[in-house]
Amino acid sequence: MRGFEAKEYQDRVLKLQKKMQDKNIDITLITSPHNFRYFTGLDSYFWESPTRPWFLLIPQSNDPIAIIPSIGETALQKTWIKNIQTWPSPQPEDEGVSALMESLKNIIPHTGNIGCELGQESHLRMSINDFDTLRKNLSNCNFIDASEIIWQLRIIKSQEEIKKIKKIISIASDVFDNLPNYIKIGMTEIEICNIFKKELLNKGADHTLYMSCASGVGGYNQIICDPTEKKLQDGDLLIIDTGTTLDGYFCDFDRNYGFGNIKKEVNDAYLILWEATEKAFEKTKPGLTCADISNAMGSILNKPNLASNSVGRMGHGLGLQLTEPPSIMNSDKTILKENMIITIEPCYEYLPGKMIVIEENILITKDGYELLTSRTPKLLPIIN
Protein backbone atom coordinates (compact mmCIF):
# COMPACT_ATOMS: atom_id res chain seq x y z
CA MET A 1 0.00 0.00 0.00
CA ARG A 2 1.01 3.63 -0.43
CA GLY A 3 1.82 5.41 2.78
CA PHE A 4 1.05 3.67 6.07
CA GLU A 5 -1.89 2.86 8.28
CA ALA A 6 -2.94 5.71 10.58
CA LYS A 7 -1.42 3.92 13.57
CA GLU A 8 2.09 4.37 12.13
CA TYR A 9 1.71 8.16 12.20
CA GLN A 10 -0.12 8.17 15.52
CA ASP A 11 2.72 6.20 17.11
CA ARG A 12 5.23 8.73 15.77
CA VAL A 13 3.28 11.59 17.34
CA LEU A 14 2.98 9.76 20.67
CA LYS A 15 6.74 9.12 20.73
CA LEU A 16 7.42 12.78 19.97
CA GLN A 17 5.00 13.88 22.69
CA LYS A 18 6.84 11.72 25.23
CA LYS A 19 10.13 13.37 24.25
CA MET A 20 8.45 16.79 24.43
CA GLN A 21 7.40 16.05 28.01
CA ASP A 22 10.96 15.07 28.87
CA LYS A 23 12.30 18.31 27.34
CA ASN A 24 9.49 20.52 28.71
CA ILE A 25 8.33 21.50 25.22
CA ASP A 26 4.65 22.49 25.25
CA ILE A 27 4.10 22.39 21.51
CA THR A 28 6.20 21.58 18.45
CA LEU A 29 5.83 23.63 15.27
CA ILE A 30 6.51 21.64 12.09
CA THR A 31 7.07 23.52 8.83
CA SER A 32 9.49 21.48 6.69
CA PRO A 33 8.22 19.08 3.99
CA HIS A 34 9.82 15.86 5.24
CA ASN A 35 8.83 16.35 8.87
CA PHE A 36 5.32 17.31 7.78
CA ARG A 37 5.11 14.10 5.76
CA TYR A 38 6.66 12.04 8.57
CA PHE A 39 3.91 13.00 11.02
CA THR A 40 0.92 13.35 8.65
CA GLY A 41 1.53 11.07 5.67
CA LEU A 42 0.88 13.82 3.13
CA ASP A 43 2.37 12.72 -0.21
CA SER A 44 2.83 15.75 -2.43
CA TYR A 45 5.52 17.58 -4.37
CA PHE A 46 3.54 20.79 -4.05
CA TRP A 47 6.32 21.82 -1.68
CA GLU A 48 8.35 22.65 -4.79
CA SER A 49 6.28 25.84 -4.93
CA PRO A 50 7.78 28.14 -2.28
CA THR A 51 4.82 30.54 -2.21
CA ARG A 52 2.76 28.98 0.58
CA PRO A 53 3.97 27.81 4.01
CA TRP A 54 2.31 24.86 5.77
CA PHE A 55 2.17 24.48 9.54
CA LEU A 56 1.60 21.49 11.81
CA LEU A 57 1.24 21.98 15.57
CA ILE A 58 1.88 18.97 17.78
CA PRO A 59 0.84 19.70 21.38
CA GLN A 60 2.33 17.85 24.33
CA SER A 61 -1.00 16.01 24.49
CA ASN A 62 -3.98 15.75 22.11
CA ASP A 63 -3.95 15.39 18.33
CA PRO A 64 -2.01 17.58 15.90
CA ILE A 65 -3.49 20.71 14.36
CA ALA A 66 -2.75 21.53 10.73
CA ILE A 67 -2.87 25.15 9.58
CA ILE A 68 -2.48 25.13 5.82
CA PRO A 69 -3.30 27.02 2.60
CA SER A 70 -6.85 26.31 1.44
CA ILE A 71 -5.54 24.69 -1.76
CA GLY A 72 -4.23 21.79 0.35
CA GLU A 73 -7.32 21.03 2.42
CA THR A 74 -8.75 18.24 0.26
CA ALA A 75 -5.37 16.52 0.00
CA LEU A 76 -4.73 16.64 3.75
CA GLN A 77 -8.22 15.33 4.49
CA LYS A 78 -7.08 12.04 2.91
CA THR A 79 -4.57 11.59 5.74
CA TRP A 80 -5.28 10.74 9.39
CA ILE A 81 -5.20 14.43 10.41
CA LYS A 82 -8.67 15.62 11.48
CA ASN A 83 -8.11 19.13 12.84
CA ILE A 84 -7.41 21.19 9.72
CA GLN A 85 -7.57 24.98 9.58
CA THR A 86 -7.03 26.93 6.37
CA TRP A 87 -6.47 30.42 5.04
CA PRO A 88 -6.82 31.74 1.47
CA SER A 89 -3.38 31.82 -0.13
CA PRO A 90 -1.32 33.38 -1.69
CA GLN A 91 -1.74 36.22 0.80
CA PRO A 92 1.71 37.80 1.21
CA GLU A 93 0.55 40.36 3.77
CA ASP A 94 -0.46 37.55 6.16
CA GLU A 95 0.59 34.10 4.94
CA GLY A 96 -1.11 32.12 7.71
CA VAL A 97 0.72 33.88 10.54
CA SER A 98 -2.43 35.25 12.23
CA ALA A 99 -4.10 31.84 12.16
CA LEU A 100 -0.94 30.22 13.50
CA MET A 101 -0.63 32.77 16.33
CA GLU A 102 -4.27 32.30 17.33
CA SER A 103 -3.88 28.53 17.58
CA LEU A 104 -0.66 28.85 19.58
CA LYS A 105 -2.30 31.30 22.00
CA ASN A 106 -5.20 28.90 22.51
CA ILE A 107 -2.81 26.09 23.41
CA ILE A 108 -0.38 28.24 25.44
CA PRO A 109 -2.50 31.09 26.92
CA HIS A 110 0.21 32.36 29.27
CA THR A 111 3.82 31.20 28.98
CA GLY A 112 5.50 28.12 27.58
CA ASN A 113 8.08 26.57 25.28
CA ILE A 114 7.51 26.22 21.53
CA GLY A 115 9.79 23.72 19.80
CA CYS A 116 10.90 24.54 16.26
CA GLU A 117 13.14 23.07 13.55
CA LEU A 118 16.15 25.21 14.42
CA GLY A 119 19.05 22.75 14.68
CA GLN A 120 21.48 20.89 12.46
CA GLU A 121 20.12 19.40 9.20
CA SER A 122 16.80 21.16 9.82
CA HIS A 123 15.19 24.34 8.57
CA LEU A 124 12.07 26.48 8.84
CA ARG A 125 9.90 26.60 5.75
CA MET A 126 8.43 30.02 6.42
CA SER A 127 9.94 33.43 5.88
CA ILE A 128 12.30 34.70 8.57
CA ASN A 129 10.22 37.89 8.66
CA ASP A 130 7.09 35.87 9.49
CA PHE A 131 8.97 33.87 12.11
CA ASP A 132 10.19 37.11 13.70
CA THR A 133 6.60 38.40 13.71
CA LEU A 134 5.51 35.20 15.43
CA ARG A 135 8.15 35.56 18.13
CA LYS A 136 7.41 39.25 18.74
CA ASN A 137 3.68 38.60 19.14
CA LEU A 138 4.27 35.61 21.42
CA SER A 139 6.89 37.23 23.62
CA ASN A 140 5.57 35.25 26.58
CA CYS A 141 6.86 32.06 24.94
CA ASN A 142 10.33 30.67 24.42
CA PHE A 143 11.14 29.40 20.92
CA ILE A 144 13.59 26.53 21.34
CA ASP A 145 15.12 23.84 19.17
CA ALA A 146 13.13 20.62 18.72
CA SER A 147 15.13 19.21 15.82
CA GLU A 148 17.18 16.92 18.07
CA ILE A 149 14.15 15.02 19.40
CA ILE A 150 12.62 14.82 15.91
CA TRP A 151 15.82 13.28 14.53
CA GLN A 152 15.96 10.86 17.47
CA LEU A 153 12.70 9.45 16.12
CA ARG A 154 13.48 9.59 12.43
CA ILE A 155 16.89 7.89 12.51
CA ILE A 156 15.30 4.70 13.90
CA LYS A 157 13.16 3.21 11.14
CA SER A 158 9.96 1.26 11.74
CA GLN A 159 9.49 -2.14 10.12
CA GLU A 160 7.12 -0.58 7.59
CA GLU A 161 9.67 2.06 6.65
CA ILE A 162 12.37 -0.58 6.30
CA LYS A 163 10.20 -2.53 3.84
CA LYS A 164 9.87 0.50 1.57
CA ILE A 165 13.56 1.36 1.72
CA LYS A 166 14.54 -2.24 1.01
CA LYS A 167 12.25 -2.26 -2.02
CA ILE A 168 13.67 0.85 -3.67
CA ILE A 169 17.23 -0.29 -2.97
CA SER A 170 16.44 -3.66 -4.56
CA ILE A 171 15.02 -1.95 -7.65
CA ALA A 172 18.06 0.29 -8.08
CA SER A 173 20.45 -2.61 -7.42
CA ASP A 174 18.88 -4.64 -10.23
CA VAL A 175 19.13 -1.72 -12.65
CA PHE A 176 22.77 -1.05 -11.75
CA ASP A 177 23.63 -4.74 -12.13
CA ASN A 178 22.07 -4.88 -15.61
CA LEU A 179 23.29 -1.50 -16.87
CA PRO A 180 26.39 -2.94 -18.64
CA ASN A 181 24.01 -4.72 -21.03
CA TYR A 182 22.75 -1.34 -22.30
CA ILE A 183 25.82 0.89 -22.51
CA LYS A 184 28.94 1.09 -24.67
CA ILE A 185 31.95 3.22 -25.51
CA GLY A 186 30.94 6.38 -27.40
CA MET A 187 27.70 7.02 -25.51
CA THR A 188 27.39 10.27 -23.56
CA GLU A 189 26.91 10.54 -19.81
CA ILE A 190 23.42 11.92 -20.46
CA GLU A 191 22.48 9.01 -22.73
CA ILE A 192 23.66 6.47 -20.16
CA CYS A 193 21.87 8.19 -17.28
CA ASN A 194 18.65 8.48 -19.29
CA ILE A 195 18.73 4.72 -19.90
CA PHE A 196 19.33 4.23 -16.19
CA LYS A 197 16.40 6.46 -15.19
CA LYS A 198 14.03 4.80 -17.66
CA GLU A 199 14.93 1.36 -16.31
CA LEU A 200 14.33 2.55 -12.74
CA LEU A 201 10.83 3.67 -13.71
CA ASN A 202 10.19 0.45 -15.61
CA LYS A 203 11.14 -1.55 -12.51
CA GLY A 204 8.71 0.37 -10.27
CA ALA A 205 10.56 3.40 -8.88
CA ASP A 206 8.64 6.66 -8.44
CA HIS A 207 11.14 9.48 -8.87
CA THR A 208 14.84 9.97 -9.44
CA LEU A 209 15.34 13.18 -7.51
CA TYR A 210 19.12 12.95 -7.44
CA MET A 211 21.45 11.53 -10.04
CA SER A 212 25.04 12.66 -10.18
CA CYS A 213 27.43 11.42 -12.82
CA ALA A 214 31.08 12.00 -13.61
CA SER A 215 33.76 10.42 -15.75
CA GLY A 216 37.37 10.83 -16.72
CA VAL A 217 40.48 8.92 -17.68
CA GLY A 218 41.29 6.78 -14.64
CA GLY A 219 38.92 8.65 -12.33
CA TYR A 220 36.85 11.78 -11.81
CA ASN A 221 37.31 15.06 -9.92
CA GLN A 222 33.81 15.57 -8.46
CA ILE A 223 30.75 13.49 -7.55
CA ILE A 224 27.84 15.93 -7.25
CA CYS A 225 27.03 17.28 -10.74
CA ASP A 226 24.50 16.25 -13.37
CA PRO A 227 25.56 14.15 -16.37
CA THR A 228 26.98 16.02 -19.36
CA GLU A 229 27.32 15.49 -23.11
CA LYS A 230 30.81 14.08 -22.63
CA LYS A 231 31.31 10.84 -24.58
CA LEU A 232 32.81 7.86 -22.78
CA GLN A 233 36.14 6.89 -24.31
CA ASP A 234 38.73 4.16 -23.89
CA GLY A 235 40.31 4.38 -20.42
CA ASP A 236 37.47 6.35 -18.82
CA LEU A 237 36.01 5.57 -15.40
CA LEU A 238 32.31 6.41 -14.98
CA ILE A 239 30.40 6.84 -11.73
CA ILE A 240 26.63 7.11 -11.37
CA ASP A 241 25.20 7.97 -7.95
CA THR A 242 21.44 7.79 -7.59
CA GLY A 243 18.93 9.01 -5.05
CA THR A 244 15.74 7.37 -6.27
CA THR A 245 12.50 7.11 -4.29
CA LEU A 246 9.58 4.79 -3.72
CA ASP A 247 6.66 6.17 -1.73
CA GLY A 248 8.88 8.98 -0.50
CA TYR A 249 11.78 6.83 0.73
CA PHE A 250 15.25 7.04 -0.80
CA CYS A 251 17.98 4.73 -1.86
CA ASP A 252 21.40 6.36 -2.18
CA PHE A 253 24.33 4.50 -3.66
CA ASP A 254 26.65 4.46 -6.65
CA ARG A 255 28.39 2.14 -9.05
CA ASN A 256 31.55 2.52 -11.15
CA TYR A 257 32.20 1.24 -14.66
CA GLY A 258 35.48 1.15 -16.58
CA PHE A 259 35.48 1.66 -20.36
CA GLY A 260 37.93 -0.21 -22.55
CA ASN A 261 41.51 -0.50 -21.35
CA ILE A 262 41.80 0.48 -17.70
CA LYS A 263 45.25 0.99 -16.19
CA LYS A 264 46.47 -1.24 -13.38
CA GLU A 265 46.72 1.72 -10.98
CA VAL A 266 42.98 2.35 -11.42
CA ASN A 267 42.04 -1.26 -10.71
CA ASP A 268 44.39 -1.24 -7.70
CA ALA A 269 42.82 1.93 -6.31
CA TYR A 270 39.33 0.50 -6.82
CA LEU A 271 40.30 -2.66 -4.92
CA ILE A 272 41.74 -0.64 -2.02
CA LEU A 273 38.43 1.22 -1.77
CA TRP A 274 36.45 -2.03 -1.91
CA GLU A 275 38.57 -3.40 0.94
CA ALA A 276 37.85 -0.23 2.94
CA THR A 277 34.13 -0.96 2.73
CA GLU A 278 34.79 -4.50 3.98
CA LYS A 279 36.54 -3.01 7.02
CA ALA A 280 33.57 -0.72 7.57
CA PHE A 281 31.17 -3.67 7.66
CA GLU A 282 33.19 -5.21 10.49
CA LYS A 283 32.40 -2.18 12.68
CA THR A 284 28.75 -1.91 11.71
CA LYS A 285 26.73 -3.20 14.65
CA PRO A 286 24.78 -1.82 17.61
CA GLY A 287 26.87 -0.30 20.37
CA LEU A 288 29.69 0.88 18.13
CA THR A 289 29.79 4.41 16.75
CA CYS A 290 29.89 6.23 13.44
CA ALA A 291 33.47 7.15 14.32
CA ASP A 292 34.33 3.46 14.67
CA ILE A 293 33.16 2.85 11.09
CA SER A 294 35.08 5.87 9.81
CA ASN A 295 38.26 4.85 11.62
CA ALA A 296 37.96 1.33 10.21
CA MET A 297 37.98 2.70 6.68
CA GLY A 298 40.80 5.02 7.64
CA SER A 299 42.90 2.02 8.64
CA ILE A 300 42.93 1.08 4.95
CA LEU A 301 42.97 4.52 3.36
CA ASN A 302 45.15 6.54 5.75
CA LYS A 303 48.47 4.93 4.96
CA PRO A 304 51.80 6.31 3.73
CA ASN A 305 51.94 6.95 -0.01
CA LEU A 306 48.15 7.00 -0.32
CA ALA A 307 46.49 10.25 -1.39
CA SER A 308 43.48 11.94 0.23
CA ASN A 309 40.50 9.73 0.90
CA SER A 310 37.54 11.84 2.00
CA VAL A 311 35.12 14.50 0.82
CA GLY A 312 34.23 15.42 4.40
CA ARG A 313 32.56 12.23 5.56
CA MET A 314 32.27 8.62 4.46
CA GLY A 315 28.56 7.95 4.80
CA HIS A 316 25.35 9.17 6.42
CA GLY A 317 21.81 8.28 7.42
CA LEU A 318 19.11 7.54 4.85
CA GLY A 319 15.31 7.61 4.78
CA LEU A 320 12.73 10.19 3.74
CA GLN A 321 15.68 12.36 2.75
CA LEU A 322 18.67 11.56 0.59
CA THR A 323 20.97 12.32 3.48
CA GLU A 324 20.01 12.28 7.14
CA PRO A 325 21.94 12.18 10.42
CA PRO A 326 24.23 10.71 11.54
CA SER A 327 27.46 11.27 9.61
CA ILE A 328 30.11 8.59 9.17
CA MET A 329 33.13 10.62 10.22
CA ASN A 330 35.77 10.52 12.93
CA SER A 331 34.12 13.26 14.98
CA ASP A 332 30.60 11.75 15.03
CA LYS A 333 30.22 9.66 18.17
CA THR A 334 26.61 8.69 17.47
CA ILE A 335 26.01 5.18 18.80
CA LEU A 336 24.65 2.75 16.21
CA LYS A 337 21.25 1.31 17.10
CA GLU A 338 19.06 -1.42 15.67
CA ASN A 339 16.93 -0.30 12.70
CA MET A 340 19.11 2.61 11.69
CA ILE A 341 19.76 2.73 7.95
CA ILE A 342 23.08 4.24 6.89
CA THR A 343 25.29 4.53 3.86
CA ILE A 344 28.94 3.48 3.75
CA GLU A 345 30.67 5.83 1.28
CA PRO A 346 34.47 6.01 1.28
CA CYS A 347 36.19 8.28 -1.22
CA TYR A 348 39.75 7.69 -2.40
CA GLU A 349 41.62 10.30 -4.45
CA TYR A 350 44.58 8.18 -5.48
CA LEU A 351 46.05 10.91 -7.69
CA PRO A 352 45.26 14.65 -7.81
CA GLY A 353 41.94 15.09 -9.60
CA LYS A 354 41.35 11.33 -9.88
CA MET A 355 38.99 9.99 -7.24
CA ILE A 356 36.92 6.84 -6.87
CA VAL A 357 33.88 6.47 -4.59
CA ILE A 358 32.01 3.32 -3.56
CA GLU A 359 28.71 3.53 -1.68
CA GLU A 360 26.54 0.85 -0.07
CA ASN A 361 23.30 0.99 1.96
CA ILE A 362 23.21 -0.82 5.30
CA LEU A 363 20.54 -1.74 7.86
CA ILE A 364 21.71 -2.03 11.47
CA THR A 365 20.28 -5.26 12.88
CA LYS A 366 20.07 -6.64 16.41
CA ASP A 367 23.44 -8.39 16.15
CA GLY A 368 25.17 -6.67 13.25
CA TYR A 369 24.12 -5.43 9.83
CA GLU A 370 22.25 -6.37 6.68
CA LEU A 371 23.65 -5.24 3.34
CA LEU A 372 20.66 -3.85 1.43
CA THR A 373 22.42 -3.06 -1.84
CA SER A 374 23.70 -5.80 -4.09
CA ARG A 375 27.41 -5.78 -3.25
CA THR A 376 29.68 -3.64 -5.39
CA PRO A 377 31.73 -6.05 -7.55
CA LYS A 378 35.20 -6.69 -6.13
CA LEU A 379 36.66 -6.23 -9.61
CA LEU A 380 35.80 -3.12 -11.60
CA PRO A 381 33.13 -3.90 -14.26
CA ILE A 382 34.52 -3.22 -17.74
CA ILE A 383 32.48 -1.96 -20.71
CA ASN A 384 34.03 -2.86 -24.09
Predicted stretch roles:
Residues M1-N384:
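Active-site neighborhoods and metal-handling regions in enzymes and metal-associated proteins
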